[in-house]
From Swiss-Prot:
The organism of origin for this protein: Thermosynechococcus vestitus (strain NIES-2133 / IAM M-273 / BP-1)
Transmembrane regions: 37-57, 96-116, 130-150
NCBIfam families linked to this entry: cytb6_f_IV
GO cellular component, one term: plasma membrane-derived thylakoid membrane
Protein name: Cytochrome b6-f complex subunit 4
UniProt xrefs under InterPro entries: Cyt_b/b6_C, Cyt_b/b6_C_sf, Cyt_b6/f_cplx_suIV, Cytochrome_b_C_euk/bac
Location in the cell: Cellular thylakoid membrane
One Pfam family named in its UniProt record: Cytochrom_B_C
Gene from which the chain derives: petD
Length: 161
């Protein structure tokens, strides 16, 4: 079984000399306690909270158009995260084929770990097959999501052609 953590070789005299000077953490990783957990994380959390509260107070933007219970919109769109699947249902003429295509998405996601399992590298740039599949899936998802906001006749070309 492969090791998850890289432990330092404390018998190395060069590393021991660096550690005496307060250096050498990059050799085996900087310790999370107390550096990250006590100092960096609270600063990031407080900064994020301050940013969200500041934006909410300074610019209370409307989320969308006010609701009118007496007027039905021309096209009802789902939430933004459902745009790609909505676009598949909208574009594919056969609804059973649309359901099968949407069912293939989780199946494809389950197959991702097995695509390049023989490659032992963790760096994504040294795993070309997995990186290509990931980038292709991301681009198709973005293309379908953006196309769902267009009318049906322009949704596949995104209004470019």
């Amino acid at each position: 079984m492969a090791k998850v953590l890289k432990k330092p070789d404390l018998t190395n005299p060069a590393l021991r000399a660096k550690l005496k000077k307060g250096m050498g953490h990059n050799y085996y990783g900087e310790p999370a306690w107390p550096n990250d957990l006590l100092y960096i994380f609270p600063v990031v959390i407080m900064g994020t909270i301050a940013l969200v509260i500041g934006l909410a107070v300074m610019d209370p933007a409307m989320v969308g158009e006010p609701a009118d219970p007496f007027a039905t919109p021309l096209e009802i769109l789902p939430e933004w995260y459902l745009y790609p699947t909505f676009q598949i249902f909208r574009v594919v003429p056969n609804k059973l084929l649309g359901v099968l295509m949407n069912a293939s998405i989780p199946l494809g996601l389950m197959l991702i770990p097995f695509i390049e399992s023989v490659n032992k590298f963790q760096n994504p740039f040294r795993r070309p097959v997995a990186m290509t599949v990931f980038l292709f899936g991301t681009l198709v998802t973005l293309w379908l999501g953006i196309g769902a906001a267009f009318p049906l006749d322009k949704s596949l070309t995104l209004g470019l052609f």
